């Protein structure tokens, strides 16, 4: 079942949580709502679920207006960050809860409930824990049980609010890959909230970048990474250097450094910022003929296959970050305190707005 939101707005007092947000999600699609704290992503998720009401706009499921439909009638599965499992119930009883509290006319028989619960526990690969209590489970196991409970009521839509946020990094990585595989089996429209860029880019079919209550960009993980639509998206998705210069007729310049600025073909000495990823910066020793930004190597730290360099510009001491393969760093023989030239080889240039 598809999900569509049209012109959603929501205020909490003077704070504008959502500002005319519109979005369409297809059946079977896994969509990530990504952004910093306070950007509106959880508010949007809660309005879709029916846990929060919008001041304006509408929510449609499969083309039918569900804006005023009670949360209990929306057939939405919701998974919270902190599991919300009943401590006094076993794993089996937690998963069965949504089925057992249905109105008598809609409640399955105990035999069908048992079969359904065992099937779901098998789906999340935890059928062997049916008689355990939440306190006897790991964080990752609790989250999978919470997901099984959400699926027990056969939701038309699955919503997850930072489902792995309370878990350690290794477990989080394992579970998000598991969620991707599970979603492909279920084939329902799923939306999950996260502030973790890596999580969104790895798991989602599409990523919705949100900022200050508005959508900045919607696209596949590859699209938003390779072609960020706004300075915010560029800055939020990974590390980036911001180099202030000027653009004229599609060329950005800073001192002797020149880079293409195809988005600014009519610019005439316009202030512009080049957004450069650390891995798109080459290094040369000071005194070479090649153009570059004079810097001094402040600090180096090695992490796996890469060396991360903190460079201080010699004109204003602003920091530039560079990332080079560890073997290349060792072959260059660079030392902290050494004078170098930072040479950006690729950038996305945005005009400075007046």
Swiss-Prot record:
This is Sulfate/thiosulfate import ATP-binding protein CysA. Residues 3-237 form the ABC transporter domain. Its EC number is 7.3.2.3. GO terms for molecular function: ABC-type sulfate transporter activity; ABC-type thiosulfate transporter activity; ATP binding; ATP hydrolysis activity. It is an enzyme of class 7 (translocase). The keyword Membrane applies. Keywords: ATP-binding, Cell inner membrane, Cell membrane, Membrane, Nucleotide-binding, Sulfate transport, Translocase, Transport. It is found in: Cell inner membrane. Disulfide bonds: none annotated. Belongs to the ABC transporter superfamily. Sulfate/tungstate importer (TC 3.A.1.6) family. Pfam families: ABC_tran (PF00005), CysA_C_terminal (PF17850), TOBE_3 (PF12857). The complex is composed of two ATP-binding proteins (CysA), two transmembrane proteins (CysT and CysW) and a solute-binding protein (CysP). One of its GO terms (cellular component) is ATP-binding cassette (ABC) transporter complex. It is a peripheral membrane protein. Part of the ABC transporter complex CysAWTP involved in sulfate/thiosulfate import. Responsible for energy coupling to the transport system. ATP binds at residues 35-42. It catalyses: sulfate(out) + ATP + H2O = sulfate(in) + ADP + phosphate + H(+); thiosulfate(out) + ATP + H2O = thiosulfate(in) + ADP + phosphate + H(+). SUPFAM superfamilies: MOP-like (SSF50331), P-loop containing nucleoside triphosphate hydrolases (SSF52540).
């Amino acid at each position: 079942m598809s999900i569509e939101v049209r012109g959603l707005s929501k205020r909490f007092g003077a704070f504008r949580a959502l500002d005319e947000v519109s979005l369409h999600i297809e059946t079977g699609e896994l969509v990530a709502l990504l952004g910093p704290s306070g950007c509106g992503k959880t508010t949007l998720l809660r309005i879709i679920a029916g846990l929060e009401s919008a001041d304006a706009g509408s929510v449609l499921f499969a083309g039918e207006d569900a804006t005023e439909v009670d949360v209990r009638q929306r057939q939405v599965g919701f998974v919270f960050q902190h599991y919300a499992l009943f401590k006094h119930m076993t794993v089996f009883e937690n998963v069965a809860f949504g089925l057992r509290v249905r109105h008598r006319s809609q409640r399955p028989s105990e035999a069908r409930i048992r079969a359904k619960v065992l099937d779901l526990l098998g789906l999340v690969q935890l059928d062997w824990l049916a008689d355990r209590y939440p306190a006897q489970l790991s964080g990752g196991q609790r989250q999978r049980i919470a997901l099984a409970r959400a699926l027990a009521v056969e939701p038309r839509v699955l919503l997850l609010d930072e489902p792995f946020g309370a878990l350690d990094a290794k477990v989080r990585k394992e579970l998000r890959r598991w969620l991707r595989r599970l979603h492909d089996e279920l084939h329902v429209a799923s939306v999950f909230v996260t502030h973790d860029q890596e999580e969104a880019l790895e798991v989602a079919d599409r990523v919705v970048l949100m900022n200050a209550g508005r959508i900045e960009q919607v696209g596949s993980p590859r699209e938003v990474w390779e072609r960020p639509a706004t300075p915010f998206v560029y800055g939020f998705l990974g590390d980036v250097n911001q180099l202030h210069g000027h653009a004229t007729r599609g060329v950005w310049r800073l001192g002797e450094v020149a880079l293409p600025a195809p988005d600014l073909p009519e610019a005439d000495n316009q202030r512009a910022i080049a957004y450069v990823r650390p891995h798109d910066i080459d290094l040369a020793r000071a005194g070479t003929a090649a153009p570059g930004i004079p810097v001094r190597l402040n600090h180096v730290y090695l992490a796996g296959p890469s060396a991360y360099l903190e460079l201080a510009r010699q004109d204003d001491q602003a920091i530039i970050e560079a990332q080079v393969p560890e073997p290349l760093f060792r072959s260059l023989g660079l030392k902290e305190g050494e004078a170098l030239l930072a040479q950006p080889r690729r950038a996305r240039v945005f005009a400075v707005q007046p």
